[in-house]
Swiss-Prot record:
Primary location recorded for the protein, binned into one broad class: nucleus
Region described as Disordered: spans on this chain: 1-66, 107-126, 153-176, 258-319, 339-378, 395-416
Name of this protein: Probable DNA-binding protein creA
GO molecular function, one term: RNA polymerase II cis-regulatory region sequence-specific DNA binding
Family annotation (Pfam families): zf-C2H2
GO CC annotations, alphabetized: cytoplasm; nucleus
Family: Belongs to the creA/MIG C2H2-type zinc-finger protein family.
Subcellular location: Nucleus
Basic and acidic residues bias locations: 54-64, 263-272
Gene that encodes it: creA
Entry-linked InterPro entries: creA/MIG_C2H2-ZnF, Znf_C2H2_sf, Znf_C2H2_type
Length: 416
């Protein structure tokens, strides 16, 4: 049997074998040969890759009207063409509907296969996604709580009218935010902190030196208002006022700052000039402090000399021989003074030079106004003709000394 016989099993030689099998028994060898031929034909389609079953041959002849405009492929159905075009364009219209999943697919069967991951409770990917979502939610909640606690701890005390009242029990814990009544907050500071008590919880609760200085200034102001009404004992901060060897107290520091500035309740202004101050109860502190005003004598002169000039020092002016006294506190400006005080001339007082004093010789303006250039010369200074009393007079001292000590004045005297 040749290869052509295998491809064409329905040849005329094999057709009579079937009737012979039914009619008589002597045709048994032909029947066995025909069975071997059918077995070879049944095994042939798996061996031949290009061959198709006989029942699919009519589909190969069906028309393919739906052709891809981007390539040479054609399809029987429109949805097949549409699905194929998405491979060229990259369109993925099928999105996953599971919350938190952002995957998209171009085919609906891919979406169905992907949805089984979320629907299967035993999936490792599903458990991992749930753990990640829970961890992200917990981290966001912790961050919100931390921001809220920081905002509450850094909240300044409210600026309300101050009234004396007893402390309330709600301010017993240092970890809570400042209470609604500032007087209760001041009473809590007066009763629980003690004279310069070092509390380890103060740093963790956000109560920095600004809040303590404000509270101490309130206590000091209340004690100062009731000082003239009757005899009062020394309060808890009073022991630091009369000891000049120690650093000034916190309440006196706050009062000295408030006396030179306006008594407004602007917390930004109150905090701006206390930022770089060191802790007053530190024994090794070297930061300069402001002058401390005692209760017994509210004199304009401080109890001790500061290491640096405060920001509210009086404006500089030339001093004479008869007055070496600073102005009183009432003459100081109550407004916010700049860091560098401007040097403004102040005409009042007997120690300043006045233009009413007599001049010797022509003035500089008269010399410069002369038309002739040869006459524009400075006259020879007549120093020997001035009396000794005029040199020692307070009105002439500042002018003559400044003119004689200057380099330009010495050059003019040597020139002539």
């Amino acid at each position: 049997m040749g290869f052509s016989d295998l491809l064409n099993p329905q040849n005329p030689e094999s057709t009579p074998s079937t009737p012979a099998n039914k009619s008589s028994a002597p045709s048994t060898p032909s029947t066995g040969q025909s069975n071997s031929n059918m077995t070879s034909v049944s095994l042939l389609p798996p061996l031949m890759k290009g061959a198709r079953p006989a029942n699919e041959e009519p589909r190969q002849d069906l028309p393919r009207p739906y052709k891809c405009p981007l390539c040479d492929r054609a399809f029987h159905r429109l949805e097949h063409q549409t699905r194929h075009i998405r491979t060229h364009t990259g369109e993925k219209p099928h999105a996953c509907q599971f919350p938190g999943c952002t995957k998209r697919f171009s085919r609906s069967d891919e979406l169905t296969r992907h949805s089984r991951i979320h629907n299967n409770p035993n999936s490792r990917r599903n458990n991992k996604a749930q753990h990640l979502a829970a961890a992200a939610a917990a981290a966001a909640a912790n961050q919100d709580n931390a921001l809220a606690s920081n905002a509450a701890s850094m909240m300044p005390p409210p600026s309300k009218p101050i009234t004396r009242s007893a402390p309330v029990s709600q301010v017993g814990s240092p970890d809570i935010s400042p209470p609604h009544s500032f007087s209760n907050y001041a009473g809590h500071m007066r009763s629980n902190l003690g004279p310069y008590a070092r509390n380890s919880d103060r740093a963790s609760s956000g109560m920095d030196i600004n809040l303590l200085a404000t509270a101490a200034s309130q206590v000091e102001r209340d004690e100062h208002y009731g000082f003239h009404n009757g005899p009062r004992g020394h309060h808890i901060f009073g022991s630091r006022h009369h000891n000049s060897n120690r650093l000034p107290s916190l309440s006196a520091y706050a009062i000295s700052q408030n006396m030179s500035r306006s008594h407004s309740h602007d917390e930004d202004d109150m905090y701006s000039h206390r930022v770089k101050r060191s802790r007053p109860n530190s024994p090794n502190s070297t930061a300069p402090s402001s002058p401390t005003f005692s209760h017994d004598s509210l004199s304009p002169t401080p109890d001790h000399t500061p290491l640096a000039t405060p920001a509210h020092s009086p404006r500089l002016r030339p001093l004479g021989t008869s007055e070496l006294q600073l102005p009183s506190i009432r003459h100081l400006s109550l407004h916010h003074t700049p860091a560098l005080a401007p040097m403004e001339p102040q005409p009042e007082g007997p120690n300043y030079y006045s233009p009413t004093q007599p001049h010797v010789g022509p003035s500089i303006s008269d010399i410069m106004s002369k038309p002739d250039g040869t006459q524009r010369k400075l006259p020879v200074p007549q120093v020997p003709k001035v009396a000794v009393q005029d040199l020692l007079s307070p009105g002439f001292t500042s002018v003559s000394s400044s003119a004689s000590n200057s380099v330009a004045g010495g050059d003019l005297a040597d020139r002539f």
